[in-house]
């Protein structure tokens, strides 16, 4: 039986959020490199610690803004804006 489009979208959103809430330093560094964002291992560790085990929803505007504010505190506003662009690509916005 084929998944309904809405169910399919919810499933994909779940996968993205699950990855966000369990991302590791190496994965963050790889994503940063793929998207041309300078990120040190120490910064990646800090971001991963902020995200790990939380129930953030990247598709929720207030959650996304909360995450970006935490990231801006680690890497600065300019790089947080670059990361926001990646988030928007991931969420299709």
Write out the residue ranges for each language-model feature.
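Intrinsically disordered, low-complexity linker/tail regions enriched in Pro/Ser/Thr
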Residues: 1-17
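N-terminal acidic leader/helix
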Residues: 12-41, 45
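Protein-protein interaction and targeting regions used for scaffolding, dimerization, and localization
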Residues: 13, 41, 54, 58-62
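Short acidic/histidine-centered micro-motifs embedded in hydrophobic/aromatic stretches
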Residues: 31, 47-50, 86-89
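Short alpha-helix boundary/capping elements
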Residues: 36, 52-59, 75, 79
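Amphipathic alpha-helical segments that form the core helices of the histone-fold
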Residues: 47-56, 68-69
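Long, compositionally biased
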Residues: 61-92
């Amino acid at each position: 039986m084929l998944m309904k489009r809405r169910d399919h979208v919810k499933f994909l959103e779940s996968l993205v959020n699950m990855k966000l809430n369990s991302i590791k330093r190496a994965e963050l560094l790889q994503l940063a490199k793929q998207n041309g964002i300078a990120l040190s291992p120490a910064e990646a560790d800090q971001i991963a610690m902020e995200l790990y085990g939380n129930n953030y929803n990247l598709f929720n505007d207030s959650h996304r803004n909360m995450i970006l504010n935490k990231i801006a505190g680690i890497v600065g506003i300019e790089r947080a804006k670059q990361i926001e662009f990646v988030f928007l690509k991931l969420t299709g916005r």
